[in-house]
């Protein structure tokens, strides 16, 4: 009798995706982040669901309801901090996952890569709207500053911003709709993740060498299930260390002050995972130019497959490209640091140089370096 795992319509899909899936035998720990992102998404949906049971999306009670969750709800504090720090873990895994794709040339699976970019935008939008919900000072002013950027769009800008606000400023209508979107978008992300996986399984996984591995595959279970469990345990360990020992390490103290439209905080800044993009936005003195640079800093990923000039897929055997890649990582860390600093000398200049370097590496230096490496190898 055939195994039900291989015949049942639903079990068959799970079997072909997570059990009998033919996988390259040499994929490293950098391939763990896909499953870790899935775990992060499930964790965020579950903790978010329990938070939504006690949260009220009204300007007069939102801040109090979050305080109530932390003080009065059974284990509300741990749910709240797992959700807040879970978002940080989510973005750490996201950036590692995208970095892996860039390093090993996984972007040559264009459908998977493009769905991934849409997923990235979806999760960024979700995180931004979630940051507004506690209705602290940084929530309110962050929402005001970021939504105001849309007013840079010629002709329709102002009307568009007021349409998103649901009034003439960030107020009750804005908070209610942000809560609605913050609740629905993770489910959209789940559907997109399924499509992401569907396209990946059409081609099979890439591997560190970049060489096709069709002739040499191993089943996903037990080899990679056990490896993913180890990754998941490490993820949960780091998350719980954060939650239980320093839950506010990555947050902003200003968000413990209730939102006050009459008092602007001295330094308005987003959560740490958006600081690199915020630094790029601030480094351009023109409003529209800044908004375009902000969008392009992520959208640039979409044209990476078109800029692939190397005859090798990954960077495993391309030392000059490797140096450029790590320079890009250092540049992004510099931008993250600059995004959290006040707008004054020397931070302005450093931010502008780091922003120029970011686009230079991706658009100019990497394609040229790949051509040079091809010539060195006489390919």
Swiss-Prot record:
Keywords, comma-separated and alphabetical: Electron transport, Heme, Iron, Membrane, Metal-binding, Mitochondrion, Mitochondrion inner membrane, Respiratory chain, Transmembrane, Transmembrane helix, Transport, Ubiquinone
GO cellular component: mitochondrial inner membrane; respiratory chain complex III
Source organism, top-level taxon: Eukaryota
Cofactor(s) required for function per UniProt: heme b
GO BP: mitochondrial electron transport, ubiquinol to cytochrome c
Stored InterPro entries: Cyt_b/b6_C, Cyt_b/b6_C_sf, Cyt_b/b6_N, Cytb/b6-like_sf, Cytochrome_b, Cytochrome_b_C_euk/bac, Cytochrome_b_N_euk/bac, Di-haem_cyt_TM
GO molecular-function terms, A-Z: metal ion binding; ubiquinol-cytochrome-c reductase activity
Membrane topology classification: Multi-pass membrane protein
Binding positions (a ubiquinone): 201
Sequence positions that bind heme b b566: 97, 196
Annotated cofactor note: Binds 2 heme b groups non-covalently.
Membrane-spanning intervals of the chain: 33-53, 77-98, 113-133, 178-198, 226-246, 288-308, 320-340, 347-367
One Pfam family from the record: Cytochrom_B_C
Chain sites annotated for binding heme b b562: 83, 182
Protein location: Mitochondrion inner membrane
Family: Belongs to the cytochrome b family.
Record function comment: Component of the ubiquinol-cytochrome c reductase complex (complex III or cytochrome b-c1 complex) that is part of the mitochondrial respiratory chain. The b-c1 complex mediates electron transfer from ubiquinol to cytochrome c. Contributes to the generation of a proton gradient across the mitochondrial membrane that is then used for ATP synthesis.
Subunit-structure text: The cytochrome bc1 complex contains 11 subunits: 3 respiratory subunits (MT-CYB, CYC1 and UQCRFS1), 2 core proteins (UQCRC1 and UQCRC2) and 6 low-molecular weight proteins (UQCRH/QCR6, UQCRB/QCR7, UQCRQ/QCR8, UQCR10/QCR9, UQCR11/QCR10 and a cleavage product of UQCRFS1). This cytochrome bc1 complex then forms a dimer.
Additional remarks: Heme 1 (or BL or b562) is low-potential and absorbs at about 562 nm, and heme 2 (or BH or b566) is high-potential and absorbs at about 566 nm.
Identification of the protein by name: Cytochrome b
Originating organism: Lobodon carcinophaga (Crabeater seal)
Organism classification: Eukaryota, Metazoa, Chordata, Craniata, Vertebrata
Gene this protein is translated from: MT-CYB
